[in-house]
Amino acid sequence: MAKHAFLSASASHRWINCPPSAKLCEGIKDESSHYAQEGTDCHELCAYLVEMALGRDVEDPTENLTYYSGEMQNCAEEYRDYVLEQFERSKKFCSDPMVFIEQRLDFSRWVENGFGTGDCVIIADEVLHIIDYKHGLGAVSYTHLTL
């Protein structure tokens, strides 16, 4: 299982509103669910499709994805297309934009031992484009703290 930061970006909605909750939750087993695993599988598929489209040597994870489906494939392809669109757009003002997929992001300068994972980070000169893939049910607001 992936390592999680004590003050993780994904749990910031909780610890910003209730700072003691970070300490109280320490040591409590982080139990996954079907929905969380499906999201993890789709993130893995998304990363693969983007990396392939960028010409990188990556292994197809499809046969190892527990929740793989045609719908998941369609969602991942839409994500890939969006990332590639943003990458192409960034080439209009930067000759060599960089794309990082599933990149560890360290914000420990502001939060002790703080880090998270960026689904897609595009660096194009002075522009930083962060794309956070969301999968599953529920609405995501632009006010969501991880965005």
Across the structure, where does each feature detected by a protein language model lie?
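Metal-dependent nuclease catalytic cores that hydrolyze phosphodiester bonds in DNA/RNA
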Residues: 1-128
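Short beta-strand-loop-alpha-helix junction that forms the active-site gateway
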Residues: 133-142
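Conserved small/polar residues in nucleotide/adenosyl-binding loops
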Residues: 143-147
